[in-house]
Swiss-Prot record:
UniProt cross-references to PANTHER family, sorted A to Z: PHOSPHOLIPASE A2, PHOSPHOLIPASE A2 FAMILY MEMBER
SUPFAM superfamilies hit by this protein: Phospholipase A2, PLA2 (SSF48619)
Pfam families, sorted: Phospholip_A2_1 (PF00068)
Signal peptide positions (record): 1-27
Source taxonomy: Eukaryota, Metazoa, Chordata, Craniata, Vertebrata
Gene Ontology CC entries for this record: extracellular region
UniProt organism field: Oxyuranus microlepidotus (Inland taipan)
Keyword Disulfide bond: yes
GO biological process terms on file: arachidonate secretion; lipid catabolic process; phospholipid metabolic process
InterPro entries: PLipase_A2 (IPR001211), PLipase_A2_Asp_AS (IPR033112), PLipase_A2_dom (IPR016090), PLipase_A2_dom_sf (IPR036444)
Disulfide bonds: C38-C98, C54-C144, C56-C72, C71-C125, C78-C118, C87-C111, C105-C116
Record's protein name: Neutral phospholipase A2 paradoxin-like beta chain
Subunit organization: Heterotrimer of alpha, beta, and gamma chains; non-covalently linked.
Length: 145
């Protein structure tokens, strides 16, 4: 084997070892992102909601910074309620549709229905509120008490 091939192989192995420490995103978070984009009709990238305020994209604590952040707080509370019913919201994937008439859940199991309803309500809520760029990536330790 040529030395150049060995270097490439070594680089790939090292990068894979480093990537093993990065936890994968829950699948339903990806679904929720698509649901947000459907609800807001691509007005704002869904990733902009991942680190917004005190509750969007984090476990959440403190007082929400605005109504948009309250949407995420409500979703977190909905997820907590789903957990009380034996569901695992961050691991639960569900069936839904994005059509001309809007969003629609068409899941089968109790947990899928519950989690989809949480995400559906949150996506619709986010679509109704104004996005304030000043609340993106805030210092949550100082601001969210």
């Amino acid at each position: 084997m040529h030395p150049a091939h060995l270097l490439v192989l070594l680089a790939v192995c090292v990068s894979l070892l480093g990537a093993s420490d990065i936890p994968p995103l829950p699948l339903n978070l990806l679904q929720f992102g698509f649901m947000i984009e459907c609800a807001i009709r691509n007005r704002q990238p869904a990733l902009d909601f991942m680190n917004y305020g005190c509750y969007c994209g984090t476990v959440g604590h403190g007082t929400p910074v605005d109504d948009l952040d309250r949407c995420c707080k409500t979703r977190n509370e909905c997820y907590a309620e789903a957990e009380k019913h034996g569901c695992y919201p961050s691991l639960t994937t569900y069936r839904w549709q994005c059509g001309r008439v809007g969003l629609h859940c068409n899941s089968k199991t109790q947990c899928e229905v519950f989690v989809c309803a949480c995400d559906l309500a949150a996506a619709k809520c986010l679509a109704q509120e104004d996005y304030n760029p000043a609340h993106f990536n805030i210092n949550t330790k100082a601001r969210c008490r």
